[in-house]
Amino acid sequence: MGSAGSKKQSKQQRGLRERLLRTQEEPYGKLSEGQRKQSSRSPGGSDKDLNSPSCEGRNAPRAEGGGQQDTDDSDEDNEVGVYVRPNRPLRSMTYKMAIDMSHFIKEKGGLEGIYYSERRHRILDTYLENEEGIVSGWQNYTYGPGIRYPRTFGWLWKLVPVDIPEEERGAETSCLVHPAQISSWDDIHGETLAWRFDPLLAHDYVAFNRYPEEFGYQSGLPEKE
């Protein structure tokens, strides 16, 4: 029985990766390893280069065992590889759970370099609510512009603006369903954002320290009229 349960959990985890994280070999709309390292050397800057994304994957057959980041909007919303109903009692996100879930997601493929969108935001919320019983509403970030820091202390994934070079804004990335385009639609500042893992966020509550006004009464500052 234990073996069957482990296989079921492993299948659900693969479902999340296929639906949200996609495969590491997948080139469409994801930052390369070299580009991530270049960005990490410039904490205050944005990524200057991207893999050249393609819209071909929209109509091309899916490779066995993998998906394409620019085709996930055509999938069924409910097919995220998780339980239909919460598998555990509902509970609020805590610092320890945020740390654990951040590392869990990193170990299972990570969000690193994946374009952020409201739809992927909801998929992640749904997964953690149904699998871990964590009530949605915890996944909030500072308003921007610039780097968006998580407002939930312990969540180690921030959102970093990504610059798309002018020469790459041609036919390939002009496809409206491409995540490089959709991400900027979801952002009030029109920036294309990608997830970035930052372990230092476990010790430094950047969102609260830099932007206390965004926390309202919790900051101790007088609220605006």
Curated annotation (Swiss-Prot):
Gene3D superfamilies: Nef Regulatory Factor. Pfam families: F-protein (PF00469). GO terms for molecular function: GTP binding. It is a lipid-anchor. Disulfide bonds: none annotated. InterPro entries: HIV-1_Nef_core_sf, HIV_Nef. Residues 1-85 are annotated as: Disordered. Residues 70-79 have a biased composition (Acidic residues). A motif (PxxP) lies at residues 86-89. A lipid is attached at G2 (N-myristoyl glycine). The keyword Membrane applies. Residues 70-77 are annotated as: Acidic. Residues 15-36 have a biased composition (Basic and acidic residues). This isolate is from a Gambian case of 'neuro-AIDS'. The N-terminal domain is composed of the N-myristoyl glycine and of a cluster of positively charged amino acids. It is required for inner plasma membrane targeting of Nef and virion incorporation, and thereby for infectivity. Belongs to the lentivirus primate group Nef protein family. This is Protein Nef. It comes from Human immunodeficiency virus type 2 subtype B (isolate UC1). The gene is nef.
